């Protein structure tokens, strides 16, 4: 069966820039994919890598694909292409074949409630107040906060104010994007390890400090993120939490 592949670039500005320890993200860009078979069935996919090096690899992979190709060739590409390209093509093929989407007998599964991402720094408190007003309270909500974006003393003060405002049923995830050193990460873990609202510290140390990550995980909950991208073998061996993004793997 021959499949026709169309690609369209997209780029849009985020409503609010995302500050992380690695810098500031102001826009998202990628490709919208459309697959069509000989019977007119259509499937859609998206390729939206986060890292610049991923974007270049995806650009090259998509540029190498012909506009028409046999399904067997496409399936071979899925196994060899960069993760975001494999996901986008796989999603389009799955919808075209009726595995997911309107043609599927099961339809789409309901998405779980996401964690609410709070802005980094002092803007976090006003965003928390706005969330409480819009949701009628903060009970049973999960919040994610980017840390290691400002001086540690300021962030520790903001943490205490945040903890004062969160009810006992709320959950908290702190994402350092590898921006802490060992002493800073340990200080945060010691402060939070006995707080039942803590889900985890996400990528508290740099990818290169795997020993430090393992030592910190012995003190409290640690989730790996960037480490899994650069060392995929950890997806099988890491016994703690893992932040997984199928769209990028």
Label the model's feature ranges:
Residues 1-172, 177-179, 190-195:
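N-terminal capping/lid subdomain adjacent to the active-site entrance of alpha/beta enzymes
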Residues 145, 150-249:
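Catalytic core of soluble alpha/beta enzymes
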